[in-house]
Amino acid sequence: MIHSKKLFLFYILTLIFIISCNQQQTRTEIKTIGVVDMKLTSPAFANNDAIPSEFTCDGADVSPPLIISDAPSNAKSLALVMDDPDAPVGTWDHWIVFNIPPSTKQIAKGTEPYGVAGKNSWGRTGYGGPCPPSGTHRYFFKLYALDTELNLPEGATKKDLERAMKEHIIAKAELMGTYKRTR
């Protein structure tokens, strides 16, 4: 009888512990979800749509216009990365800019935002538009809000940027466009 009471008490305490852990995990998930409201859009193409050829190697190869909204008020800087994970040699970096002022609301067509330019996979700074060798590729424009300005030189690589941003990202927004050459 005493053994069954102890066993019953053990089961009840275990159940209470599991329920409280589950509730704590749910609260953490909700808190994390509520942090990211920042948005990155473009008037040139919608998320998951084709990027117009004007912004590619088949056109003028200029950067598309981008609109930034709802950046966190406590952000000290923004970082922008555009890459292509479908490249045959692995992810190809098209555009890297960091230490963008957090007050930036738009990046006009064909311009570089105020900030520090990183080095793309062509080994140069600045925008390099989509130019897939074959098939449809996805191009991710990733915007990061950071709680600090980064101490990196011009020409830093995406790997350098990712290392420096670690532990400093307070929000992220993403815009994805596709492109297929029609040669």
Task: Walk through the language-model features, giving the residues of each.
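Bacterial N-terminal signal peptides
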Residues: 10-18
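N-terminus-centered regions that define maturation/targeting leaders and the start
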Residues: 21-183
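Intrinsic disorder/low-complexity segments, especially N-terminal tails and targeting/processing regions
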Residues: 4, 18-20
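Bacterial N-terminal signal peptides that target proteins for export
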Residues: 2-9
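Generic detector of short alpha-helix boundary/capping microenvironments
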Residues: 9-10, 36
